Curated annotation (Swiss-Prot):
Described purpose of this protein according to its UniProt entry: Involved in transcription antitermination. Required for transcription of ribosomal RNA (rRNA) genes. Binds specifically to the boxA antiterminator sequence of the ribosomal RNA (rrn) operons.
Any one Gene Ontology cellular component term annotated for this protein: cytosol
UniProt entry keywords in alphabetical sequence: RNA-binding, Transcription, Transcription antitermination, Transcription regulation
Species per Swiss-Prot/TrEMBL record: Staphylococcus haemolyticus (strain JCSC1435)
Protein name, as recorded: Transcription antitermination protein NusB
């Protein structure tokens, strides 16, 4: 299965972990999907989810200067997660920035409000 589907599952896992009432660990959250989606790249999903959670303060500090009149806390949870995921990949992978940004834009089109993909694209274009 492609990285696109694995990124989507990483996003959904991070969203689930952000829920206030959850006590799930990263491994538990990922294990929930293994039965339903055995063809996904679980090494990549684990790397991305763990990386985002472990580096959250650094990722937030990297994102904040590019928000222009917004605070990270005011962003939709979906946008915050997408920005963190893409920023982590930009900083810690060999994947071309254009691919990472495009995948983030596609996630925003699917999971965020109508025009938020433009905001995501603008912020990430300044980070790369």
């Amino acid at each position: 299965m492609s990285r696109k589907e694995s990124r989507m599952q990483a996003f959904q896992t991070l969203f689930q972990l952000e829920m206030k009432d959850t006590e799930l660990t990263i491994n538990e959250a990922i294990n929930f999907i293994k039965d339903d989606e055995p063809e996904l790249d679980f090494d990549f999903i684990h790397w991305l989810v763990t990386g985002v959670k472990d580096h959250e303060p650094v990722l937030d500090d990297t994102i904040k200067p590019h928000l222009k009149d917004w605070s990270l806390q005011r962003l939709l949870k979906t946008d915050r997660i997408i920005l963190r995921m893409a920023t982590f990949e930009l900083l810690h992978s060999d994947t071309p920035p254009k691919v990472i940004i495009n995948e983030a834009v596609e996630l925003a089109k699917q999971f965020s409000d109508d025009e938020h993909y433009k905001f995501i694209n603008g912020v990430l274009s300044n980070i790369k």
